């Protein structure tokens, strides 16, 4: 597919199967978990599996494949077991992506849990400085994802993401993944032309539009500023179709991957429905 619309696909049956699923759904881009998203230790990727994934992707016609880190990782956690496991797991993810030829990893900045956002952000900064130094084989980027700000989750504001990037010794290693559901739930109104223009101007001023390297395309079950992360099919939630229309027609984002994370339905059938709707805008 010539455009950059895509979806998150399962790796059930092997990493290369995600590529087959993306092509079958009519995707131009792809996002995957490289292992089970709810286990700290993943099955090591064999050389055979890595080669098969690389060759499948090269032959697929897909523009790009992006990894998403596992849900358990919390690099904002205070010192202790969760932080230690998170550092190890993200380091493993970086090493795996290097072997698979994936050069972008989307991640949630994490939760500060019991103290302050400022303390949590400092821990994220420290974690990435350590990870970049300890995993030189991964030469790609980490894409910090905008979040809805549930509970003590970090990344609700562009300013928090800016703090991580500016605080790191390696600011050039970061990009941003803009989740349409999360930003709306966080209070950024992209549902009107004026609101969309204002949000993108804020993003450009604080982070730089050149860092916006991926979209997660999700409608929201909850309202503007709700700080609740609940994805909905495109056009069936509180965002409506306009934010997606604005992005699809924005010349600045033509070659930026736009990844669906909406409910799948039977046999991933809803991916094709959502992709067709987006292409009709």
Swiss-Prot record:
Zn(2+) 2 binds at residues 145, 179, 216, 261. Pfam families: AP_endonuc_2. Zn(2+) 1 binds at residues 68, 108, 145. CDD domains: AP2Ec. The keyword DNA repair applies. Its EC number is 3.1.21.2. Binds 3 Zn(2+) ions. This is Probable endonuclease 4. The lineage of its organism: Bacteria, Pseudomonadati, Thermodesulfobacteriota, Desulfuromonadia, Geobacterales. The gene is nfo.
């Amino acid at each position: 597919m010539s455009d950059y619309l895509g979806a998150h696909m399962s790796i059930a049956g092997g990493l290369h199967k995600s590529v087959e699923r993306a092509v079958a759904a009519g995707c131009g881009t792809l996002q995957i978990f490289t292992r089970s998203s709810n286990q700290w230790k993943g099955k090591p990727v064999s050389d055979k599996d890595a080669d098969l994934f690389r060759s499948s992707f090269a032959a697929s016609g897909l523009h790009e494949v992006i990894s998403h880190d596992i849900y358990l990782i919390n690099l904002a956690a205070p010192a202790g077991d969760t932080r230690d496991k998170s550092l190890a797991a993200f380091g493993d993810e970086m090493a795996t992506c290097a072997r698979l030829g994936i050069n972008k990893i989307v991640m949630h900045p994490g939760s500060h849990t019991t103290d302050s956002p400022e303390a949590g952000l400092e821990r994220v900064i420290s974690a990435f400085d350590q990870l970049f130094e300890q995993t030189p084989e991964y030469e790609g980027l980490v894409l910090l994802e905008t979040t809805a700000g549930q509970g003590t989750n970090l990344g609700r504001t562009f300013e928090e993401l800016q703090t991580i990037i500016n605080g790191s010794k390696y600011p050039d290693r970061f990009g941003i993944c803009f989740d349409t559901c999360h930003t709306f739930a966080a209070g950024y109104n992209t549902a009107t032309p004026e609101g969309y223009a204002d949000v993108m101007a804020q993003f450009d001023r604080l982070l730089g539009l050149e860092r916006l390297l991926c979209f997660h395309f999700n409608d929201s079950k909850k309202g503007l500023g709700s700080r609740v992360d609940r994805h909905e099919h495109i056009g069936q939630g509180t965002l409506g179709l306009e934010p997606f229309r604005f992005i699809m027609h924005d010349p600045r984002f033509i070659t930026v991957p736009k990844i669906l994370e909406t409910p799948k339905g039977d046999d991933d059938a809803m991916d094709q429905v959502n992709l067709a709707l987006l292409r009709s805008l």
